[in-house]
């Protein structure tokens, strides 16, 4: 009996770098005052959307620094805040982008999305075991597990997708009338 053994192909590891619950929580805690202010203060929210739509990074940084004293390492397209990590030349980034890219943010749609993600961010900031489970799902690239952890905290009929990506996650919302897709992300970037 000469049975041929099938050659086992090596399991391809995902390209994610491992992110820790501490890095995730620190990033979320740094942006949480900003998102709270967007929800709490209509004038601040309108000023923010105006700065984003006119690509006024100086005004965006000024507005962010009014509510969070966290140092910003990057402000990118759409908008994003990059925070240093212990990993050399790596930032953990949180922000939004809009698809199609040439679209303009509206105060109302932006507010709806921020209100939807706020419960998730509050939980990540305050619940270490939850942040640990989310981080484990991110590090393993397990989008199904990540969905089951996050989806119950985001109560919005506009929620489109939740994905593990780049040692972080992307949460997308679609507004049917405008056909715009707002994507909130927290992921590892280059600094």
Regions inferred by a protein language model and the residue ranges of each:
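C-terminal-biased regions
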Residues: 2-191
């Amino acid at each position: 009996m000469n049975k041929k053994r099938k050659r086992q192909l090596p399991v391809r590891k995902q390209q994610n770098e491992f992110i820790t619950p501490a890095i995730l929580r620190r990033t979320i805690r740094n942006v949480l005052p900003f998102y709270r202010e967007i929800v709490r203060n209509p004038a601040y929210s309108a000023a923010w959307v105006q700065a984003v739509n006119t690509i006024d990074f100086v005004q965006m940084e000024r507005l962010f620094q009014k509510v969070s004293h966290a140092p910003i390492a990057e402000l990118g397209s759409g908008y994003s805040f990059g925070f240093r990590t212990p990993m050399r030349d790596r930032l953990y980034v949180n922000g939004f982008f809009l698809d199609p890219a040439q679209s303009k943010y509206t105060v109302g749609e932006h507010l709806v999305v921020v209100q939807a993600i706020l419960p998730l961010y509050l939980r990540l900031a305050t619940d270490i075991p939850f942040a640990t489970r989310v981080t484990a799902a991110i590090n393993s690239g397990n989008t199904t597990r990540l969905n089951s952890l996050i989806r119950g905290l985001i109560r919005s009929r506009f929620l489109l997708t939740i994905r593990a990506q780049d040692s972080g996650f992307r949460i997308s919302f679609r507004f049917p009338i405008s056909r715009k897709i707002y994507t909130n992300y927290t992921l590892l970037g280059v600094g």
